Amino acid sequence: MTSRTSLTIVLAAGEGTRMRSSLPKVLHQVAGETLLAHVLKAAPEGDGAALAVVIGPDHQAVAEEVGRVRPQATTYVQRERLGTAHAVLAAREAIAAGADDLLVAFGDTPLISAATFARLRQPLAQGVALVALGFRPADPTGYGRLLVQNDRLVGIREQADASADERAIGLCNAGVMAIDGKAALRILERIGSANAKGEYYLTDAVAIARELGLEAAVIETSEDEVRGINTKAQLAEAEAVMQARLRQAALDAGVTMIAPETVFLAADTTFGKDVTIEPFVVIGAGVSIGDGAVIHAFSHLVQAKIGKNASVGPYARLRPGTSLGDGAKIGNFVETKAAQIDPGAKVNHLTYIGDAHIGPNANIGAGTITCNYDGFGKHKTEIGAGAFVGSNSSLVAPLKIGAGAYVGSGSVVTRDVPDDALAVERNQQKVSEGWAKRFREAKTRGKTRPAK
């Protein structure tokens, strides 16, 4: 198998009108990745594995996603949407290059696995010319049935054309197919459009292969793996299946999740050893969590790196570009963005840290705000090692607070603070003795304010 070359053609030209969205269907997301990205990542890769993606004429965003996920892939445009076989032949140039195995998949099936693609190719190495992927849905209504005799696929019958006996067959066509590369164009170019819609259907390839004296077979997989996404409801169903997979994989890897069903992960989330995730945590794309870290309840993380033995939350929001050092702490109702928080630093309560670098073992008091935006651009705040910022302070960037410096509570700091210095910016406190007593007496007599 490893010596056989392959070409995977992913069909992604559909409009997806039932999604009721201006976004192309294959660019909707499951577990922080587009539907298309999931399929592209599952397709064979490495030496001898080519990849082609067929897109619509107005799908530049889809082409860009292909380039982001699999830069070596080639895109082809299906200018008229005339059926699945017509879409495959949009990549005729790639097919003609003569890979040993041709795989045809769909860009809206995010749950398909690399293992399934590998199983689909195995019969080709044994001389079978065409392999269809089948599944057994709980309700087969509407699906084409796979007709099998003596362990060989003899046809695909659409629901509308099936006899009563054929409709009783539980094995259905998933649409995914593997074809011997040497026979692929011979089969595909014989597919006609003599049907009610005047389209070219890939399912006709089975009958044509048999007419040519070639063998066809079936490989079965689960219904979940081949879920196609056509509506927002189906998108939600696929998300649920993917989340269940990701949670189980995390648990198997040793992550402690107190209530797994309340935790949402991304497809690329990575965990170290002895990580604990409390209930109602949402982890978006691009998050890595180091050994011994704890993510407390109701926290939300996206594109963030969490160091060893660090603590996040509860009720924390870590936005893209956050890097939390070993043993650092982000407490409750703290938001960070583009922030490097070094080992041992603490940001414990009610704070916004954006476009900032906080040095090792610095302490940021409750209610501190980095004022990073002046209405036109973002500016950086740098806080040195061991610095202490008192509660309710506003740090107006660009700003540097030196190592070991102190900022008095309630200060609005607009100028740099040297190492080991104290910065205090607030009005002098005024105390009027007896004022409160006079105020109460005045109110009692009906006056509005007491004498000063």
UniProtKB/Swiss-Prot annotation:
CDD domains: GT2_GlmU_N_bac, LbH_GlmU_C. Residues 233-253 are annotated as: Linker. It is an enzyme of class 2 (transferase). Binds 1 Mg(2+) ion per subunit. It catalyses: alpha-D-glucosamine 1-phosphate + acetyl-CoA = N-acetyl-alpha-D-glucosamine 1-phosphate + CoA + H(+); N-acetyl-alpha-D-glucosamine 1-phosphate + UTP + H(+) = UDP-N-acetyl-alpha-D-glucosamine + diphosphate. Residues 254-452 are annotated as: N-acetyltransferase. The active site is at residue 349. Pfam families: Hexapep, NTP_transf_3. Its EC number is 2.7.7.23, 2.3.1.157. Homotrimer. In the N-terminal section; belongs to the N-acetylglucosamine-1-phosphate uridyltransferase family. In the C-terminal section; belongs to the transferase hexapeptide repeat family. Catalyzes the last two sequential reactions in the de novo biosynthetic pathway for UDP-N-acetylglucosamine (UDP-GlcNAc). The C-terminal domain catalyzes the transfer of acetyl group from acetyl coenzyme A to glucosamine-1-phosphate (GlcN-1-P) to produce N-acetylglucosamine-1-phosphate (GlcNAc-1-P), which is converted into UDP-GlcNAc by the transfer of uridine 5-monophosphate (from uridine 5-triphosphate), a reaction catalyzed by the N-terminal domain. PANTHER family: BIFUNCTIONAL PROTEIN GLMU, NUCLEOTIDYL TRANSFERASE. This is Bifunctional protein GlmU.
